[in-house]
Regions:
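Phosphate/dinucleotide-binding and metal-coordinating scaffold of catalytic cores
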Residues: 1-215
Length: 215
């Protein structure tokens, strides 16, 4: 009586089943299980071992009506999400408007470019190999590179972005990996536009205040 049946559904040319991995703080990968796309927009997650944090309550059987919540958390969002979408949308055949993305678009993005998304989960063998390779040879900036590289990274982050349209007061930002004698450290760098307008100057002043308050 507890048996349930569903048809697998291919997503683009990526197939319908993919391994899910977790990468720990030491850069080691662990296979957590397998995610399958189902006909009708649902998904099934088959764990390699019991994972109560993922499968509980209505989802104890591993069946989800949409993208499982633990992967939906990696859905692109905010300023950085829109920057990510502009970079990958054409390649995966997804809309360039983030608000039009569906679960299939998120899955394709995670499979091809999900090696550096928030959290410790990586979907698919391709993304895992990219994540492991990035950990072996990180593109880190030294202190004396920041003055020249930060403006270029800010310009790249703003490419195609109307800075005045950021919803919810989102502050333009980019991510970087910084190298020092103590090792490497991930950073989120906020910035203001170059225009020199009163609004831009206010943002710059607020960022300085935020930096001082955080010291």
């Amino acid at each position: 009586r507890s048996s349930r049946y569903a048809l697998a559904q291919d997503i683009g040319r990526a197939g319908s089943r993919w391994p899910l991995y977790r990468i720990d703080s030491l850069g080691r990968s662990e296979a957590l299980g397998e995610l399958s796309a189902l006909h009708g927009g649902g998904f099934h997650f088959a764990p390699a071992r019991p994972i109560p944090a993922f499968l509980h309550g209505d989802f104890a059987a591993g069946v989800f009506p949409g993208l499982p919540w633990f992967l939906d958390d990696q859905r692109p969002q905010g300023f950085l999400g829109r920057t990510f979408v502009r970079r990958v949308a054409t390649d995966i055949g997804a809309p360039e408007d983030l608000t039009r993305w569906q679960a299939d678009d998120v899955v394709l993005a995670l499979l091809r470019y999900g090696e550096d998304e928030p959290g410790d989960l990586v979907l698919g063998e391709h993304a895992l190999q990219r994540a492991l390779q990035a950990a072996l040879s990180p593109e880190a900036l030294s202190a004396n590179q920041r003055e020249t590289r930060y403006p270029a990274l800010a310009d790249a982050a703003l490419a195609g972005e109307d800075i005045g349209s950021s919803a919810g007061g989102e502050q333009p930002k980019f991510t970087a990996l910084l190298r020092s004698d103590a090792g490497t450290q991930a950073a989120i760098v906020k910035f203001s536009e170059r225009s020199g307008t009163p609004a831009a100057q206010r943002w710059a002043d607020l960022l300085r205040c935020e930096h001082i308050a955080g010291q």
